[in-house]
Amino acid sequence: MTVIAKIYAREILDSRGNPTLEAEVTLENAVCGRAAVPSGASTGTKEAVELRDGDKTRYLGKGVRAAVDNVNGVIAAALVGFDGADQTGLDHRLINLDGTENKGRLGANALLGVSLATAHAVAAARKQPLWMYLSTLGESKLSLPVPMMNIINGGAHADNNVDFQEFMVLPVGFASFSEALRAGTEIFHALKSVLKGQGLSTAVGDEGGFAPDFRSNVEALDAILEAIGRAGYIAGEDVLLGLDVASSEFRNNGKYNLVGENKRLTSEQFVDFLDDLVAQYPIISIEDGLAEDDWVGWKQLTERIGHKVQLVGDDLFVTNPKVFQEGITSGIANAILIKLNQIGTLTETLESIAMAHRAQYAAIVSHRSGETEDTSIADIAVATTATQIKTGSLCRSDRVAKYNQLLRIEQALGVGARYAGRDAFVSLKS
């Protein structure tokens, strides 16, 4: 029933108007699964390779015809007749078929599209929603994740002068995901009013957050605090704050260059800067606080505030189990961001989440800045031991689609639905 009969890929557009790959896997019983692959703007140097054509006369060189051809050719030839229910076996066959450490021959976008589409197909064949099927593939908790809502965009995600890439609200003080989502939405709309009142732009960035020209990163935090209050919530109780510093993007010649603050800081000084922010604001999570190659700085940051703040490795770990294990062994960070296209298969993604759970690191399932209407990450966040999800702001359909899928899952779980809330950070001490 779950033997693969056909594999097909096509070139579609992502939320930035760039080409990406969509794969379809059809089983012998004619059931079909479909998945689309996202794309990042700020990327870690150790990420799996996203295969682009490089033909400047077509889509400015960003076409993915080669990856599509790889799916329709060598990958389809190798997997037609394979039992899609053997997800681990299928993914290992994909990895071996590529034969490179970084999936650079066939492309991580080609491999991931097929890997995810197969899971969708098998779930449909079993008449199960994806989250229910995925819960049978590994460690599972079936709880609704805390949304890390990116309501102000900066850095590589916006054309403004804000250094930090994301300013997020985390609605932790609520009994259900739906209530948390409502709170985040109301704060988002309150923030729009705050920005208008300050004469600032309410245009949005790649991930749906506002992208005004604040004079500093601290100004952005102050605006969010005002919005939380205007919406009728209490910062530090109902809602906590999160940052994606994406510091690799503004580190040059060993110094962290903060344009708004007019500062060029050493690693030690930047650790002090982040520590001061945590003391002044109800910040519970900092992602990529130090550059991906600044492991000495990461160690200092972890020792300084890792007991009370979630320190998330994104560019640092790139969802790669080998790199992640080095970080665990070294005592670097205490959480990992899970981006499927950083590693390239569903099995490796689930392995990274399971590794985090065993090491008592938090796992956050994440979108990319170039997204599609695909909602797979919502199902993965519910089905695994991940406690949080990053899928952007409260506008743009490519972001809201994931939130809406989580609402559907919460309703499907009924009285058994559990929202992670503050329990997502139970290992941290105030």
Curated annotation (Swiss-Prot):
The keyword Lyase applies. (2R)-2-phosphoglycerate binds at Q165, K339, R368, S369, K390. Keywords: Cytoplasm, Glycolysis, Lyase, Magnesium, Metal-binding, Secreted. It is found in: Cytoplasm; Secreted; Cell surface. One of its GO terms (cellular component) is phosphopyruvate hydratase complex. Signal peptide: none annotated. Mg(2+) binds at D244, E287, D314. Binds a second Mg(2+) ion via substrate during catalysis. GO terms for molecular function: magnesium ion binding; phosphopyruvate hydratase activity. Its main location: cytoplasm. InterPro entries: Enolase (IPR000941), Enolase-like_C_sf (IPR036849), Enolase-like_N (IPR029017), Enolase_C (IPR020810), Enolase_CS (IPR020809), Enolase_N (IPR020811). GO terms for biological process: glycolytic process. It catalyses: (2R)-2-phosphoglycerate = phosphoenolpyruvate + H2O. SUPFAM superfamilies: Enolase C-terminal domain-like, Enolase N-terminal domain-like. Its EC number is 4.2.1.11. Pathway: Carbohydrate degradation; glycolysis; pyruvate from D-glyceraldehyde 3-phosphate: step 4/5. It is an enzyme of class 4 (lyase). The active site is at E207, K339. Its cofactor is Mg(2+). Component of the RNA degradosome, a multiprotein complex involved in RNA processing and mRNA degradation. Belongs to the enolase family. HAMAP family: Enolase (MF_00318). Catalyzes the reversible conversion of 2-phosphoglycerate (2-PG) into phosphoenolpyruvate (PEP). It is essential for the degradation of carbohydrates via glycolysis. This is Enolase. The gene is eno.
